[in-house]
């Protein structure tokens, strides 16, 4: 299963990519297990209220993630504490943590060896490249992993 998440525009990208895998990217095929942790407003607001905003992804990951899953954090800065908490928990749970990030990877680069770095500090440029990379990922998975 692939678990996507991010904040703001990156949250939208996470939802978009998970949907491409569940429904279809280009062709009719078996669904690829994927989820975005940015869609459940009840969970997001309850976790934010009861535990703190920095745990909105790690708490869901604790409930929904399994050893061998793949997480993809999407970020323009690499400095969001909620992504860092998810990276830390992923390691403890045996979940493969990957990230797309601009801004030199920010603090998040300390917590993953699987960082695709977009060499820009301009949010709009970073977001365009991140969704492009996500589309490449969807195409690859649909072509090779859904057989």
Descriptions of predicted regions:
Residues 4-5, 10-147:
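Glycine-rich phosphate-binding loops that contact phosphosugars or nucleotide phosphates
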């Amino acid at each position: 299963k692939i678990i996507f998440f991010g904040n703001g525009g990156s949250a939208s990208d996470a939802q978009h990519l998970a949907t491409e895998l569940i429904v279809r990217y280009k062709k009719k095929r078996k669904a690829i297990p994927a989820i975005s942790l940015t869609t459940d407003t009840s969970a997001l607001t309850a976790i934010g209220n009861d535990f703190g905003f920095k745990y909105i992804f790690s708490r869901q990951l604790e409930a929904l993630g399994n050893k061998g899953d793949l997480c993809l954090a999407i970020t323009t800065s690499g400095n969001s504490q909620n992504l860092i908490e998810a990276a830390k928990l992923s390691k403890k749970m045996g979940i493969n943590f990957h990230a797309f990030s601009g801004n030199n990877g920010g603090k998040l680069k300390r917590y993953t060896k699987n960082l695709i770095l977009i060499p820009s500090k301009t949010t709009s440029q970073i977001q365009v490249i991140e969704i492009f990379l996500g589309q490449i990922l969807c195409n690859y998975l649909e072509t090779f992993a859904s057989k």
